[in-house]
């Protein structure tokens, strides 16, 4: 494809060279550049692509995209300046891979909590309906039975290059639908620009990622961007910012909720240790459904999934038959079966709100104690640590504060931040920095009717310590300890 074709939808200045050259690939990593590639210089948190332009040229880049002045000389390489390299990357990748999102029923799910669960519920129901569906999110990307098994990705919403590659791969393998998590970071960094979403979904909003966004207002506004990129938005009307999304979004809206007069509602919930059943109501039709996943948030996640399928044109009565196909999601309310019949749940909850909801649900499941093992990630929103400590301290009978992914912080410093929240409500807790030892301690003090909640990492099979990923899997540790 000609560089001129790839640049057709953005404003640019040709600094030098020829835009009628053939482009055979795109990269924003200078080390991955090959002959006749275009290298897009992106400024990240730790590295600036403009510092690697010479390396990209030496590796064969036919063209380089920049968004700031570049004064060094590079021979035989076209140089193009744009306003924003991240926007340019999304534009170029969309065209280079022939606008893959337009060939799919693409559903984007945003919100603080529930994104991973909702995309898998939507996938489970669409697959049961006979529609091959790919997923992209925290657990990786996957297209079941189509030679694309779970492939890990980082971050949750891939960079525009990888995203368009994955979508094109889905299409080549026969997918008709794709469901993806759309993070606030991805929206802010233009990773999903030029994506053609059929449906956008909003789950909820609570404090998270303030290290990146600065304020909850900025965080919220990034989420709202999705509803200017799709024809219809499926939103949780019970959430505090639902009205603002409707006011600021430019799409049509379909609402769901329990507490409000939404388009799709639920009532008469019956919560059991391993399931929830409830009546679902839509346009005068009511039906009882049961899902083999417990908790109030399961009701909301199921409603979000049902609403998404309705907006994709599937009729309500057909959808009701698909609800039973919903399966538990890895690391989300995951019960660890064990020979000693200990009540142990592993969950990804890592915000004050998600921990609160998890522990409220756990209280409904037991007459015994709730013992919670948890920590907070390093190099992330420090302001939520005390709030998480307070939530766990109030709703647990005993807490063990430990390490999560400390990254470049000292685990002891993170634990102290959590501890300050616990001290405000005089909770019972102890501190064990080593996560394996903390889990071991939790199991040791667990009595017959107690529940042990191991929170924060869920599906993750690693700890990030400094710049290194060290293998660590909560479920493996539990199984080893219980032997």
Curated annotation (Swiss-Prot):
Annotated meso-2,6-diaminopimelate binding sites: 380, 404-407, 456, 460
UniProt motif Meso-diaminopimelate recognition motif: location: 404-407
Q: Where in the cell is it found?
A: Cytoplasm
Q: What is this protein called?
A: UDP-N-acetylmuramoyl-L-alanyl-D-glutamate--2,6-diaminopimelate ligase 2
What is the scientific name of the source organism?
Clostridium acetobutylicum (strain ATCC 824 / DSM 792 / JCM 1419 / IAM 19013 / LMG 5710 / NBRC 13948 / NRRL B-527 / VKM B-1787 / 2291 / W)
Q: Which PANTHER family match?
A: MUR LIGASE FAMILY MEMBER (PTHR23135), UDP-N-ACETYLMURAMOYL-L-ALANYL-D-GLUTAMATE--2,6-DIAMINOPIMELATE LIGASE MURE HOMOLOG, CHLOROPLASTIC (PTHR23135:SF4)
Top-rank taxon: Bacteria
The alphabetized UniProt keywords are: ATP-binding, Cell cycle, Cell division, Cell shape, Cell wall biogenesis/degradation, Cytoplasm, Ligase, Magnesium, Nucleotide-binding, Peptidoglycan synthesis
Cofactors named for this entry: Mg(2+)
């Amino acid at each position: 494809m000609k560089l001129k074709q790839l640049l057709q939808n953005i404003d640019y200045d040709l600094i030098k060279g020829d835009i009628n050259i053939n482009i055979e690939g795109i990269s924003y990593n200078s080390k991955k550049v090959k002959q006749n590639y275009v290298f897009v210089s992106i400024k990240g948190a730790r590295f600036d692509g403009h510092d690697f332009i010479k390396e990209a040229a030496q590796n064969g880049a036919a063209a380089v995209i920049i968004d700031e002045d570049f004064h060094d000389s590079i021979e035989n390489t076209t140089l193009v300046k744009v306003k924003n390299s991240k926007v340019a990357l999304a534009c170029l990748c969309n065209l280079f891979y022939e606008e893959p999102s337009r060939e799919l029923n693409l559903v984007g799910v945003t919100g603080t909590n529930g994104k991973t669960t909702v995309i898998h519920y939507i996938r489970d129901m669409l697959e049961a309906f006979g529609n091959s569906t790919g997923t992209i999110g925290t657990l990786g990307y996957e297209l079941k039975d189509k030679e694309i098994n779970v492939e890990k990705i980082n971050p949750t919403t891939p960079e525009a290059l990888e995203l368009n590659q994955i979508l094109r791969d889905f299409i080549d393998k026969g997918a008709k639908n794709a469901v993806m998590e759309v993070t606030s970071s991805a929206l802010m960094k233009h990773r999903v620009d030029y994506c053609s979403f059929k449906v956008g979904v909003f789950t909820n909003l609570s404090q998270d990622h303030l290290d990146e966004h600065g304020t909850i207002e900025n965080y919220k506004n990034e989420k709202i961007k999705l509803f200017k990129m799709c024809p219809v938005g499926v939103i949780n009307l019970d959430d505090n910012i639902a009205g603002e999304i409707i006011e600021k979004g430019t799409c049509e809206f379909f609402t769901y909720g329990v507490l409000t007069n939404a388009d799709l509602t639920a009532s008469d919930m019956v919560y059991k240790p391993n399931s929830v059943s409830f009546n679902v109501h839509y346009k005068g039709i009511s039906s009882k459904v049961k899902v083999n996943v417990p908790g109030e948030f399961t009701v909301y996640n199921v409603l979000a999934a049902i609403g998404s399928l309705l907006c994709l044109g599937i009729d309500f009565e057909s959808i009701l038959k698909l609800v039973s196909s919903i399966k538990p999601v890895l690391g989300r309310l995951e019960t660890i079966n064990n020979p000693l019949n200990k009540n142990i749940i592993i969950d990804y909850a890592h915000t004050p709100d998600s921990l609160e909801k998890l522990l409220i649900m756990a209280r409904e499941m037991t007459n015994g104690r709730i013992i919670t093992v948890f920590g907070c990630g390093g190099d992330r929103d420090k302001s939520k640590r005390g709030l998480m400590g307070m939530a766990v301290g109030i709703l647990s009978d005993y807490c063990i504060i430990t390490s999560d992914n400390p990254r470049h912080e000292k685990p002891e410093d993170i634990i102290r931040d959590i501890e300050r929240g616990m001290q405000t409500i005089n909770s019972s807790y102890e501190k064990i920095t080593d996560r394996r030892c903390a889990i071991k301690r939790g199991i040791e003090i667990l009595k017959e009717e107690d529940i042990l909640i191991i929170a924060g990492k869920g599906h993750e099979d690693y700890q990030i310590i400094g710049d290194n990923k060290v293998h660590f899997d909560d479920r493996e540790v539990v199984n080893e300890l219980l032997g």
